[in-house]
Amino acid sequence: MPKKKVLTPLPYLASIVFLPWWISLSFNKSLEPWVTNWWNTKQSEIFLNDIQEKNVLERFIELEELVLLDEMIKEYPETHIQKLRIGIHKETIQLVKMQNQNDIQIILHFSTNIITLTILSGFFIMGNEELVILNSWVQEFFYNLSDTIKAFSILLLTDLCIGFHSPHGWELMIGSIYKDFGFAHNDQIISGLVSTFPVILDTILKYWIFHYLNRVSPSLVVIYHSMNE
């Protein structure tokens, strides 16, 4: 019975690692035809966000400026002007197709992410017993380390998350999440989140050190503060 109880969380741990990847891959493949058909038959002229509309308008303006430039610097025969118009028409059609495909991918990724988060939430709720065992494993492993190694591990983790160079990492991660969910890039929102998350984590860490580590292992707190200085 104890052996079975020890082995039970192992498949659960493997599922936590590989399940998001498997869900994303499978639902992307299965939902793509449906989303493509729905979006194309909807014939929507609405852009999913302002940044997409801005990019498309910029491309159209570039095409228009190229035509005006060609007409200004040289006097082309009518046949050449006609070829330019045909080329611009083809480029416009290609631009619309690319934008349409980008919209489909944004809807597909957003839907897949929502489904993945929902399934993982249910998976965590149903696997409460396995999570308790995994938590006991982590605590046992952590307590078996020396105080110096514990302090070094905490210091390394905090420097990665809330250290001097961490804002750039937070900016990349939040920007990637924004892009994956199809949201428009907003420097003000991203800067606000980057300046807020490290402060919250730093507050939680200090509270944990003061109320938990200081009671469980005072020597660890002393070593941590010495290394941090």
From Swiss-Prot:
Lipid bilayer topology: Multi-pass membrane protein
A single GO cellular-component term on record: chloroplast inner membrane
Pfam families, sorted: CemA (PF03040)
Domain of life: Eukaryota
InterPro entries in the record: CemA
GO BP, sorted A to Z: potassium ion transport
Subcellular location: Plastid, Chloroplast inner membrane
Catalytic activity entry: K(+)(in) + H(+)(out) = K(+)(out) + H(+)(in)
UniProt similarity note: Belongs to the CemA family.
Chain's role: Contributes to K(+)/H(+) antiport activity by supporting proton efflux to control proton extrusion and homeostasis in chloroplasts in a light-dependent manner to modulate photosynthesis. Prevents excessive induction of non-photochemical quenching (NPQ) under continuous-light conditions. Indirectly promotes efficient inorganic carbon uptake into chloroplasts.
UniProt-listed PANTHER family: CHLOROPLAST ENVELOPE MEMBRANE PROTEIN, CHLOROPLAST ENVELOPE MEMBRANE PROTEIN-RELATED
Name by which UniProt lists this protein: Potassium/proton antiporter CemA
Lineage: Eukaryota, Viridiplantae, Streptophyta, Embryophyta, Tracheophyta
